[in-house]
């Protein structure tokens, strides 16, 4: 009897040691723990929201990486927010918005997660972190400005609109090495169309003022002009055994309506906000003390 009792105790002890060997903490962010329960709940939630029933070992590894990353990012955002609470109304509205997007009745999303044995707290926690992120983006948007020059460059690069170009084209009088050197020196002195004096080039070159649509300018020159901003001179290039420089005086984009302009402004604004946010989140991660204790 004593021997049997000893075996039972030994087995019980071994079982408890095995259980204890499972890491209850799977990661920490600035010494704040992420628990095994949180990790498992997040994996379950991701599977439920994507209607995934089973996984291969490789897919499970990908899911684990995704879950731990989302929990780490979430922890960083909560630490950034500090004591600032997310109002319940904002959380409810965010959930309703997701339900509307997926054509679900209001109140059914959390019920669906519960039916899949998913802890709704994990989902709500992610909603809160996304709302914190949106508040950060909103704050960053107030420091973002888009210049008219940036708008013009974006529209030009789209090749959707024609452009009226005014430019000064300087052509050397001959094609020798001396002419090439003189044209290079001229290029370095060309700053603004309004400041160009005949004495700058008259001994070795001619100058022609051209105003035309970009689409009507011949191939090589069109490519050169397209990449130049106003009051910017091109490098010296060769045409018909002579050397040329183009100095763009102005660019006027034709037939852009208000809606198109606003679309470009919004696109550039969102791009700048996204870049600022990405840099901010990267700095958060770099400065944070992050430890992951998941087995590789």
UniProtKB/Swiss-Prot annotation:
InterPro entries: OMP_Chaperone_SurA (IPR050280), Trigger_fact/SurA_dom_sf (IPR027304). Keywords: Signal. It holds the Pfam family SurA_N_3. It comes from the Bacteria. Residues 1-20 form the signal peptide. The keyword Transferase does not apply. Transmembrane segments: none annotated. This is Uncharacterized protein RF_0255.
